[in-house]
Amino acid sequence: MASAGPTGAGARPPKAFTAQAGLAKLVNPAGLNSILARGKEKFGGTQAWKELMGCDVIFARSISHWYGIKGTTYYELTVALGQPLYKPVTDPELTEEEKAVMTAVQSRFAQSNSSVVLTRTLLNKTCELKDRIRELTDELGQTEVHLAREKVKAAALKLENRKLFVENQELKDQLEKERTKHGWKGLKTLCLWIFLATLIGGYITGSNAACTLVDVPSPMKVGYDTFKQMCIHKDSYLPDGAFDKESLALECSKQMDYMDCKEVITDSISGKTSFAGMLRDVFRVDEIVTAIRTVVRFAMDFSLAYPICVMFVLILTRNKKHAIISACCALVAKCCGLRLLPFTLVLTYAPSETAIAGCIYGLGYISIPLVTFLHWVGLVLKAILVPDDCYIGTRVSHALAWSIMLPMWIITQELMAFTEFPLELQIVTTVVVCTAGFGFRYLTGTVTITEPDGTVKKYKRIFNAKSAIGTISTVFFEKAKAIRGVIPSFPSKADNIVKIEVDVDGGSAGVGFRLGNYIYTAGHVVGEAKIAKITWKGLTSQAKVLGHIELPLFTDTLARLEIPKPFQQLPVFRLAKSSENDYVQMVCFDNQLQNVVTFSGWANIDGDYLNAPFETYAGTSGSPIINRDGRMLGVHFGSNAVVSQGFVITRLFATEPAVKQCKSDEDLADEIVRKVMGGIRISFASLTSELEKQRDELNALKQMVNDLIDTDLVALEKKKGKTKRTVRGQKHKTKAISKAAFMKTKVLTEEEYRRLEEEGFTKDEIKDIVDNLREQAWLDYQNQLDEEGDDDWYEQMEEDQRINDQIDQNIERDLEDRGEWYGQRKITFKQRAMLRFIQLGRQQQVATVSFPDGYEDRAEELYNKVVTTEDLPEGETSEAALSLPNKIVHQAGKRLNFKHVKIHPDKTFMKSGVTQIEEKPEGDIILKAKTTTLAPKEEPVIQQVEQQPQVEQQQQPQQPVVEEKKRTPPPKPQRKPKTGAKAKCLDCGETFVERQDFHVCKSKN
């Protein structure tokens, strides 16, 4: 069989010619229209002209001489014996340049065909995406319905929780009542209740349940029904002008006897009084005056001794324990001859040794100097030998002070024995001395404060008292004139907040405040962190998270942190006394968490929930919300649109809140409520996160559809003869890979990425490296496309020439045997099977395999071996195409096994190219150069083969031709050839080197 290349009679050797890139883009319309018109005049209406018009590309040599190319076959239209002759030619009389131009134009039309196929593919993908969007929309609707049901369930559970909470509170109150019912506190409460009930009952009880007429005029008369409601068995007053006895009796006679009615009405009137007498009677003026006179007379008779002593006794017996101790003290004081008040003070403040020493002296067994000396020695020895939390010097000083106080107490006892100094006078004297000595001294004392930055401030407490009185007055008047619509001024609390940061779960930041001896913030700010970083006035320290306080019927918690030692001067918030709708202010930091900012607005309070029109941002969670007095009202936890969501903590901190401690059986109801709320919180959070995921996926799909809609899709009209499903139309389909696919390709492995990080590259630098690699891959891919579109013509030309020669010989043989006129025969053309493989990833691989006629099964078998069922990882793409005369198979996104793409070559063409880009402001200047070299045929063979007849070798069909293009790896150092043992072929007798030469018997070539 003839080898590739023009053969046969009249064949001319191909001239050296180089086709330029972009040749298919050139157009030369000069004279073409007129030539076509003249050709139609000469050949129009003939079958030969119709066949010529069915070619892909037509070239006019002259009016009577035309060439056409269809697929890989050239056709010629001439005039023979005055008749048009249309026939296929093997070697057309065309120059290489003319052939190159026709081939380039033909490839352009094939590319248009592939664009139509790509358009249909994109339309199909668009329809699939729309179906997917419709499915996701349905799922979203179902999710929203499910969420609505869960919300209804949550509302029902919330209502049930409120009922359980109220019931639990009632049970707690009942339990508390049962505990204190028979105790000391319950007994005192019972006595006080009986006393107050007696007074109130005597105060409100009327004399006789009847009406009293008041001497005032009235324009209206009362009816019997009204009179009955006001006066029958009731103590009330009735204007004399509204009372008409006869009218009332007549109206009453409708129901009972007239005389009985008059008797009932007369009995219901107790008498008549003036308006002033009515007022004195209603307000019990006479009784109040009498009670006051009685108390004054009692005080005058018994002086102040009785009430003062009563208060003294009540304080001493404030509970059961102190009542027993006070009784013992009174007994000891009586036995030892000591005054009760000084002895009580000594027992309260002095060491027990001092009280014992006084009792010993009171018994009369020892003198004052001796008891003072022994007392002094004992206290000092105890201070020296018995350590405690105080410094030894402090303990000795205290011992010395009480050693001096003992003789003073004894001398005072002796002086009081010679004078009349009653108990009430002792109590009053003690109160006056303590008030003057300690109260005024504390009030006028100077306070020194050292700020964290080192500045020292001094002020007197009396000035703070004055300012407090002024502030209270101002707040009172501001409260009185509070009007919605006029925002009041708030006290500055810029120094009362701190910034809180944690590094757990990606890190978070918020605001904290001091309340009592702890710092508080929103629970989600610290999360599960154990340590938080706190910043105040530029000073940063670490604080331990002590726990979380559960908020009743709320989805968040309140985190409690300890106060670091450097932050002991952090100002403390005071709780608001009441929570009601009013203007409030939220104190927080700005977006950069640097400067203090405030939000002011009207707050709506519903139970423990607080809503205010604050458009907050990330980092404001945990901010304190204060009222117009500067007192702590609530805590900010988040925002819904432009409405701040907060929680009122005034009732929460009315008692010490629990911080995740163990619960007793009595708190079982609270535990159930908290567990139910926790379940609702978790289910709601999971539903919300799932809904957000579906929304994100839906938005991504919508964006993909919008991108596809915005993409310009070229839909060209089909031309006659271009619908044939051959590989020329199919192979360009693989070129329609966008640059966006390359910019998403994964070019670095995990090991390479970690190695770059270990070498000190930042994320931005690594991103730049990856982008450069992807850009270079895109340029290499474009170069390969240009090579396939522009430089494959030589190999294709040789293969086409071989097939055309064979067809031409068969046609000539048939013409000679049958003698038929060519214009009456069917057109003969050749269709070939072709494979196309492309895989783009870290390594780009492209391969094209074309087969001669009759090898369709082998092409399909090779296609099935190369294309696997394994999906490519994210960032890599692949396409495989099989073109047969009767079908086209296309597969994308599967891994391709290029190991099976191989043949036994007889010729090898080596290619090398370079692409250079010069960047200019107006655009890039691109240079592409390529060199193709025919490698010399090697002496083949790797093993011995069996001898076969020469005839079978000649009848063996032409092997398929394969083209495989890969990214050229970096050059590796060439090793020196190894010298192996020589061997001799048993068939042909040729000598070759083992493990080095590839040997094939010459008789089989």
Swiss-Prot record:
Belongs to the astroviridae polyprotein 1A family. It catalyses: RNA(n) + a ribonucleoside 5'-triphosphate = RNA(n+1) + diphosphate. It comes from the Viruses. The keyword Isomerase does not apply. One of its GO terms (biological process) is proteolysis. This is Non-structural polyprotein 1A. SUPFAM superfamilies: Trypsin-like serine proteases. Cleaved by the viral and host proteases. The protease is probably autocatalytically cleaved. Residues 940-984 are annotated as: Disordered. One of its GO terms (cellular component) is host cell membrane.
